[in-house]
Regions:
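Short, glycine-/aromatic-enriched active-site segment of Class I SAM-dependent methyltransferases
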Residues: 190-211
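Class I SAM-dependent methyltransferase SAM/SAH-binding core
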Residues: 65, 72, 80-145, 169
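N-terminal auxiliary segments of SAM/dcSAM-dependent transferases
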Residues: 1-48
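A short His-aromatic
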Residues: 162-163, 210
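Short alpha-helix
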Residues: 212-228
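Hydrophobic beta-strand segment of the Class I
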Residues: 85, 154-156
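Acidic carboxylate diad motif detector
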Residues: 186-188
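A short glycine-rich, Lys/Arg-flanked "PGG" loop and its adjoining helix->strand segment in the class I
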Residues: 168-183
């Protein structure tokens, strides 16, 4: 019970502090949010084709350097010109940039993040990518996003919701801001089966790491069913 209390009370502050420092320092050595060649590191993304060469050519260096994603939600969301997209946990803006190119000048992309320096980096990214006019950013907790009901055609998120202690609340917000018939495109970390308790405890102790807040795949899908 004590461990759960620590997670609920402190995990947001831990994540915010870690990722804000990472963004402030530019993502260089000693400022890595997810350590090593994990599925959420830039080197992994390049070597394993999470993003195509064409996509990477559209992305400013700072956005990719600070990317800690585990997938490419803007790539599989089937984004169409003119659509409105919200990125939950946009970080330095790699997926905001890619989504903005897909929805074009008639569309709009809103990036949401709780870390001030990541928001600043994201603004830098969209300016360098020449998509600032169709993008905007909100500094907000994903459990309380200041956007109206039925705002977006698509909500995307990349390796972020696993870090949120109250995943149900985050998904309630995602479904709230979606239009009727809207779409979710989520890349995230889950446990695929039985996990050694000691291994899991080690991951949970480092909540800001890539696997810290992960839950079982079955439970993850149950949350989606319950709130959506």
């Amino acid at each position: 019970m004590e461990t759960e209390t620590i997670k609920a009370g402190d995990s947001k502050d831990i994540v915010k502090s870690r990722y804000d420092a990472c963004a402030e320092q530019g993502g260089g050595e000693g400022a890595v949010c997810c350590a090593g060649d994990t599925p959420a590191s830039p080197s992994f993304a390049a070597e394993h084709g999470l993003y195509s060469r064409e996509e990477l050519s559209l992305v400013p260096k700072i956005a990719f350097t600070l990317s800690r994603g585990c997938g490419n939600p803007a790539g599989f969301a089937d984004l169409q010109p003119g659509e409105v997209v919200v990125d939950f946990g946009c970080g330095a803006g790699i997926d905001v940039v890619l989504a903005a190119h897909k929805v074009g000048p008639a569309g709009k992309v809103v990036g949401v993040d709780m870390t001030p320096h990541m928001i600043e980096r994201a603004k830098q990214s969209v300016a360098e990518a020449h998509v600032a006019e169709t993008t905007e950013f909100l500094l907000a907790d994903l459990e309380q996003v200041e956007l109206p009901d039925g705002f977006a055609d698509v909500v995307i998120s990349n390796c972020v919701i696993n870090l949120c202690p109250d995943k149900e609340a985050v998904y309630r917000e995602a479904f709230r801001v979606l239009k009727p018939g809207g779409r979710l495109a989520i890349s995230d970390i889950v446990y695929g089966g039985e996990t050694d308790p000691q291994v899991r405890e080690r991951f949970q102790a480092n909540w800001a790491g890539c696997v810290g807040g992960a839950i079982e795949e079955d439970r993850y899908f149950q949350i989606l069913q319950d709130v959506g």
